[in-house]
Each structure stands twice: as C-alpha cells, then as structure tokens.
Amino acid sequence: DKYNLELLVVDTQAPHQLNDGQYAQRRATCEQAAKILGVANLRVTADGIAKADDPFQALKETLDALPDETMKKRVRHVVTEIERVRSFVRAFASGDIEAAGRLFNASHDSLAADYEVTVPELDVAVDVARKNGAYGARMTGGGFGGSIIALVDKGRSQEVAQKIADEFEKQGFHAPRALAAYAAKSASREA
C-alpha cells in the first residue's frame, strides 16, 4: 500500500499441462547440470556468480562448461532468475517500482525463451498487461498454462484485466478470470 500499487492476478484458463513430463524434464536437466558443475544445486552456482568480480564472465564460463544448448538455456534461466529475485527485493524495498517492473518482465522473458514453459495465453496476457500500464508482468507457477501476475497502479487492475479479456476473445482463447491483490498487514490475534 505504501507505493499505491496492486497485483493483478489473471488466471488465463489455459489448462496446466504438467502431466506430460516437460516440467520434470527441465528439473532433471538442472539437476544433471549441477552434477556436471560439481555443486549440490544451481543456487550454489548462482551464489558464486553473484560474488564473482565479473559476474557476466562467471556466467559465461559456467555455461561454457555445459554440454548442450538446451542445458545452457535452462541453467541460464535458473541462475539469472535467482539474481532477479534478489534484485527485485532490493528494488521494491527502495521504492524503485520501475526497476521492479523491469525485473518482472525479464523474468517472464527468460521463462519463455530459456526455460520454455510459457504458452500463448500466458504470453498474450503478459504482453497486453505491459502495453496497458503494468510496470511489469510475468507468468507464475510451473508454466505450461495457469496464471500471470502484473504490477499495476492501484485502481487499474479492472481496466487492464478487461484489455486482456478483450484480446483473449479476439484470439479465441477461453475467457480469463482476474482479481486484484493488495498488500495488507498480517493476521494477528486480538487480546
């Protein structure tokens, strides 16, 4: 509430397609990459890259150690996503909403290009939200269907959601469902 924002959540009504093994395959690829890199998990790799004198060079060297392009893409997504989350927390805490939005956008773009877990409904919803005033928008969850979230000014969720619904109708997609989420104090017990 401090920044006068709301989080628009849009369920694209695109069914999750996690039962065909694609999500598990990505996870297995990342686990295999961690073994090749000699680490317990890719968070260890991300931490090392973040602490390097030249993180870009450290990322390049990490990716160069991997045997194929698909694995490189998956690892690039995971490692850069870990850093994006850290950067988002810093940007949001400091009130830099524009930077926080750019990080949302970069996250979705990486999920689409490197992790390859988006579907047309997710990409259209994100694109429409971005073009209609969202600071940033991204898919959420495991992908292959499901929902997006968009960071918008308070009072704009309904307008942005309607633009998404209009575009979904044009594209022949199922009508999406949307809700606005607001920051609030945590629950507590009154004495």
PLM region spans:
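Short beta-strand->loop micro-motif that forms the acidic, two-metal-ion catalytic signature
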Residues: 145-151
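C-terminal nucleotide
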Residues: 1-136, 151-191
